A protein has these predicted regions:
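Solvent-exposed loop/turn segments at secondary-structure junctions
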Residues: 48-50, 61-63, 68-71, 95-100, ...
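Accessory terminal helices/loops
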Residues: 13-24, 208-211, 222-282
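Conserved beta-strand hairpin/beta-sheet module of binuclear metal-dependent hydrolase folds
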Residues: 32-78, 163-167, 172-177
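Bacterial N-terminal signal peptides that target proteins for export
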Residues: 1-10
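Metallo-beta-lactamase
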Residues: 28-31, 35-36, 60-62, 67-70, 117-161, 168-169, ...
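Active-site metal-binding motif and surrounding structural segment of the metallo-beta-lactamase
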Residues: 33, 57-62, 70-112, 210
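Divalent metal-coordination and catalytic microenvironments
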Residues: 39, 55, 65, 79, ...
Length: 282
């Protein structure tokens, strides 16, 4: 990557973060807590920011994603409803601020942050507060309070640093934005962050080989492995349609209309994904 391309990518990453924060991170989200198991919960909200998964142990709490910084106090209030244990670890499924913005305040309370190496590099590029303390390449296991948590990176999808977090004793997967569900948000390929429409399907195939029944999506309500399979199929349909339209000499405007109609792309998705899709799938 030459210096000009690298600079353009860096600016794009920063602009995406600024856009999302300006649109959704300027006031705290209304949160509620959903119980999955006796010791496993989701702090949920509508649309943005992302879901926060909570594992409670007798040695402390593990969070998967921690929303925007402005949501910190509300997250802590939700945690106090279910436990007095401190937060020991925060696992970010990727670098975006609606999943990692709470890192600095939680680190100030003693928590350690875990991400993929790729996510840490993106955080460093944009000088994002709350940098990672521990990174993983392909997998990592965490043992706390007699419970096991497994983290995996299967490849590029929403970004190049996406990881999934498996709670094997509960057969629950926290998928991050590799999988979003319902009307929460359609597939967003963050090309500036290393995302890939071509690789996304195979990355999901890797995650789907894990043993789980329920899924916490990056955005949307807790759902099933079958719904994640359906989402996987939709990623294949999307890239096939775009590729075929490019091969058929369809215009950019025609492809945009198809994405808005068939895949519920909003302005953000068009701005962040359309040019990259056309370049990657030509």
């Amino acid at each position: 990557m030459n210096r000009r391309v690298a600079l353009a990518a860096l600016v794009s990453i920063a602009l995406l973060g600024a856009y999302v924060h300006a649109q959704f991170g300027n006031q705290p989200a209304k949160l509620d807590t959903i119980k999955i198991k006796d010791d496993l919960f989701v702090i949920h909200n509508d649309f943005v920011p992302g879901n926060t998964t909570v594992l409670v142990t007798n040695e402390g709490v593990v969070l998967v994603d921690d929303k925007f910084e402005i949501d910190h106090e509300n997250i802590m209030a939700q945690l106090k409803k279910i436990t007095n244990q401190p937060v020991k670890y925060v696992i970010n499924t990727h670098y975006h601020a609606d999943h990692s913005g709470g890192n600095p305040k939680l680190q100030g309370l003693g928590a350690q942050v875990i991400t993929s190496q790729q996510a840490r590099e993106k955080m460093a590029e944009i000088k994002q507060p709350g940098m990672t303390n521990v990174t993983l390449d392909n997998s990592l296991r965490l043992f706390i309070g007699g419970k096991r948590i497994e983290m995996y990176r299967f490849g590029r999808a929403h970004t190049d640093g996406d990881i999934v977090v498996l709670f094997p004793d509960h057969r629950v997967l926290a998928a991050g934005d590799m999988f979003t569900f319902g009307d929460a948000t359609p597939q967003l390929i963050d090309y500036a962050g290393g995302g890939s429409a071509r690789d996304w399907t195979g990355t999901l195939d890797g995650a789907l080989k894990l043993e789980f029944d329920q899924v916490v999506p990056g955005h949307g309500l807790v759902t099933t492995k079958q719904e994640m399979r359906k989402f996987r199929d939709s990623t294949l349909t999307l890239r096939t349609k775009v590729h075929d339209m490019i091969a058929g000499k369809k215009t950019k405007a025609e492809i945009e209309k198809m994405l808005r109609t068939d895949f519920k792309f909003a302005d953000l998705h068009i701005q962040r994904s359309l040019d990259g899709l056309m370049l990657e799938l030509q």
